[in-house]
Every structure is written in structure tokens, then in C-alpha cells.
Design a protein with these regions (language model features):
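Conserved phosphate-donor/acceptor-positioning beta-strand/loop module used by diverse small-molecule
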Residues: 46-81
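A common structural junction motif
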Residues: 126-129
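Solvent-exposed alpha-helices and their adjacent loops that cap or buttress functional pockets
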Residues: 26-27, 43-44, 98-101
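Short, amphipathic alpha-helical "lid/cap" segments that border enzyme active or binding sites
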Residues: 21, 115-123
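Short, polar loop motifs at secondary-structure junctions
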Residues: 36-41
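ATP-dependent small-molecule kinase phosphotransfer cores
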Residues: 1-32, 70
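Small-molecule kinase domains that catalyze NTP-dependent phosphoryl transfer to phosphate-bearing small molecules
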Residues: 1-3, 71-116
Length: 129
């Protein structure tokens, strides 16, 4: 498979972002969908409900330890690395601050609610849009 001519002199990260952006926009135009990450809020603008889910650092470390069976030091390292990676990606492609809650219409601290409650709440939000 050969790369499209318009992409020959573009960095691969830019080509990938442009391709993902097109897929996100095409998918959202066809049907309602849930998109996690990939700067979907930026790509879709006001045509979507943008949601930012977060939790305190210690809670995220605890979740990594429980879900992935990691030791505390390893879990802390992974959480920091993921935050750094997400921040760099989002800020590079959007020129926005990654964890600026003002970029989103709905922000939820997941440490304060059960997963079941959050799913029901989001289903209700969707029904009333």
C-alpha cells in the first residue's frame, strides 16, 4: 500500500492525526458514537458532548495496581508516563491545555461515583440531548 501523494513530505505523526481526524468526523456524521481520546473534542468542536473523566493521582495509582497487578512503584511510573503522553499528544495537535476543564462541557471525577452510577448518569445525559 502506497502513501497518498499529499502526505509524502509530512511527518508520520501528522499523517496519522489527519487520518484519525477524518475517521472521527466521518463516523460522527453517520451515527451517534462514543469516542475516547484522540482529540475527538477538538475534531468535532461544538457538534458533540465533550466529556473529561479524571480522578486524583492516588486513586489512579490504586486502580492500576488493582487492575494490572502492578507494584506501587511501577503503577506510579505508569500513571505519570500515561499523563505525560496524553498531555503531549493533546497539546501538540490542539494547541490547548490537556487538563483544562474549560475545554469540556462535562467533567467528572470518577473517584466520587460508582461505575454503575456513572454509566446510568451518562445514559440519562445522552437521552436528554
Amino acid at each position: 500500500m502506497q502513501m497518498q501523494p499529499q502526505y509524502h513530505f509530512h511527518p508520520m505523526n501528522d499523517v496519522l492525526f489527519e487520518t484519525q481526524s477524518k475517521i472521527i468526523k466521518d463516523l460522527a456524521a453517520k451515527e451517534d458514537c462514543i469516542l475516547v481520546g484522540r482529540c475527538a473534542d477538538y475534531n468535532l468542536g461544538e457538534d458533540c458532548l465533550s466529556l473529561f473523566v479524571y480522578a486524583p493521582y492516588e486513586e489512579r495509582v490504586k486502580n492500576v495496581m488493582e487492575r494490572l497487578g502492578r507494584e506501587e512503584k511501577s503503577a506510579r511510573s505508569l500513571v505519570k508516563k500515561m499523563d505525560k503522553t496524553r498531555k503531549a499528544y493533546y497539546e501538540f495537535f490542539t494547541d490547548r491545555k490537556w487538563n483544562d476543564l474549560g475545554n469540556y462541557q462535562l467533567c467528572i471525577d470518577t473517584s466520587r461515583f460508582s461505575q454503575n452510577f456513572l454509566l446510568n448518569m451518562l445514559a440519562d445525559v445522552y437521552k436528554h440531548m
